[in-house]
Amino acid sequence: MAQPIRIVPPSGPKQLYAVGEIPPLGHVPEKMYAWVIRKDRHGPPESSMQIEVVPTWPVGDDEVLVFVMAAGVNYNGVWAGLGQPISPHDVHKSPHHIAGSDASGVVWAIGSKVRRWKVGDEVVVHCNQDDGDDEDCNGGDPMLSPSQRIWGYETPDGSFAQFCRVQSRQLMPRPKHLTWEESASYTLTLATAYRMLFGHAPHTIKPGDHVLVWGASGGLGVFGVQLAAASGANAIGIISDNEKRDYVLGLGAKGVINRKDFKCWGQMPTVNTPEYNDWVKEARRFGKAIWDITGKRDVDIVFEHPGEATFPVSTLVAKRGGMVVFCAGTSGYNLTFDARYVWMRQKRIQGSHFAHLKQASAANQFVLDRRIDPCMSEVLPWIDIAKAHTMMWKNLHKPGNMAVLVNAQRPGLRSFEDVIEASGS
């Protein structure tokens, strides 16, 4: 007996897609999946970050909606989840927070005033935002604007979601020779390193300079080393594990020092005490190890980010008229140093925070030109985004930069066409 004919109505675009499912180009569904942090569950990443269905972001006149292929993992997500030092909800007032300050993806929708980008463009995202309407944003340094903020940390619309919302001036061309996950892993740390070394004239890196790079195998340090080498300068990489020596030398460092061979770390002892005298002797022994690499030259720039544990030594080993530039205090914020070595030798202590678009674009050009490797250490799937942050929080991640997949279904995909093919669309 013949079966009755069943007429199936044509299916139109859906209003919620599975992660990795590709909507028609430019179709913005009403809802999306995201890893969400809420104020009432601040704590470790695997409790604070939960998958939820939330409304897809609307875009303003100068904003862009990006279909996220992969996202970078950094400490912004850990801090946001912990709610420390403050809850991001107290900054942006949104009831839910989506972390993520690095992304690669495809432009999916644009605001009415966006001219530089079109739907379908493959992009990477840098994380600086501002209102664009003050003197610093117009002729000055946008990083000094009172409205300056870090997307995905001080804003609620970061990259750990199917779609993220950004200002159009956050977008940069994606290096097509990289995979989606490699493209997502480097922008925050590379642009930060670039501003540290090139953004504080006259103390900008030059050929022949010597640069001391703390944490040389870490997500930030790998770019300090590579930028120095690519600029004709000499990087002295500081490590804490001899197994990382060859890795750092392979990035272009002139020499490597294991800080565990010395005992001059932590807050500086009180001046003119026996403890201080012992500290000075050990710090000078560390300086001698630097001289063995540089040919008895003090370093022009100290690339500093551990903070409390290393800052006293950093200010000691910088040359007369040199600079200690720092962007973080991962070992603590109570920085101590012997002021005599700073004022009498006229050294500069310079704080540095991320980068503006011109600096981020210059940093990205190093990658586009294949002069800088993103040093991606590992990639995890979408379902393990909270786990990735736990690994970072507990310092269980590998050297380099970590990424997570979002809509890219597997590692190794290098174009939107690859993603469409992998999805079976």
Question: Which positions does each model-derived feature cover?
Answer:
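NAD(P)H dinucleotide-binding glycine-rich loop of Rossmann-like/cofactor-binding domains
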Residues: 79, 92, 101, 129-215, ...
